Amino acid sequence: MSVGIVLAVLLGGRVERYLVVYEAGPTGFGLARYLIDAGIECAVAAPSKLQRPSGDRVKTDARDARHLARLLHLGEIVAVAIPTVEQEAARDMVRAREDCRGDLMTARHRVSKLLLRQGIVYYGGRAWTGKHELWLRTQRFDTPGLQQAYDAAFDALLTALDRRDRLDREIEALAANSIFTPVVRRLGCLRGVSTLTAFGLAAEIGDWTRLSGRSIGAYLGLVRTEYSSGSTRVQGGVTKTGNSHARRLLAEAAWHHRPRYRPGQDLRRRWDAASPAARARGQAANARLHARWVRFDARKKCPVVANAAIARELAGWCWSLAVLDE
C-alpha cells in the first residue's frame, strides 16, 4: 500500500487524533516524515527496545501490529530520532564512503594475494604508496589467463581508490558548508578526529542534545555488559550495541591518543578554524586522554581493552564539544 493511500484512509476517517507507530528498519524514515508533515503524529520504534514475552515466538504482521499498538497505548514505545532529509543524506554519504573503504581493502587483498601466490613480494618500503603503485603497474605474466586476472584485480583497485577519493572531496566540501560545519570544526580540535571522522560522527549522531556525557557511551555500545543478581555483579566486554559506524570511528580515533602528544600541522590548522573555547576544551581532552594511555601502558593493560576505555571517554569529550555553547 502506498503512502498516499495510507494518508487518505487516515484523513478520511472521523477520528480527531491519530497515533502511528512502526518499527525502524530498511524502509527508512520517509513514511514518518510524510505523516508528520500531514499533521499526523508518528513514532519510529527502536526494535531493540520493544518488550516481548520470552515465550512469544509467533511473528506475523498482524500480531506485530497489535503488539505495537498495545505498547503505544501503554506509553512503552522507545522512539528513535527521526533525521531530516539533509541529515539522512549526509549519513548515507558517510556510509557510502565506509562501504568504499571496505571495497578498497578487499581489492588490495586480492591484488597482493594474487602476487603472493606467484611468489612476488614487494620489498621497496611501505605498501599502497605512489611508489608501490608504480611497481604494481610493471608486473607482467607470461600466462594470458593470469595476466587478465591480474589486470581485472588491479583495475578494481584503481576504481575503488578513485571512488574513495571522490567521496572524500565531496564530504570535505559538505563539511565546510552545511548544517554540520560548527560541530565538525569543534570536534576537529581532538587528536585523531579529522574532518572525515568529525563529519561522520556529526552525521551519524545528528542531535547531540538528546544525549548526555554519561549516556553517550551506552548509546554507542562502549560500556561494559553486566549480569547482576542480588549481591552478585559480573561485568563483561563492551555491549557493542547502538550505532556501529560511530563506534568504529571513535575506536580508530582513540588509538591516535597513545603516541606522545605533539600537535602537528593538521591539528593546528583545525584549531585555527575553531573558537578559542573549543580549542581550549580540545587541548584539555587531548592531554587527559594521552595521560590515561600512559597509565594504561604503565600497568601493561591489554591495548585493545585500554583503547575501548579511551574511546568511551573520547565519546564524552565529543559530546562536550558538540553541545558547547559559544
Model-identified regions with their sequence ranges:
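A detector of single, family-specific signature residues
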Residues: 1-326
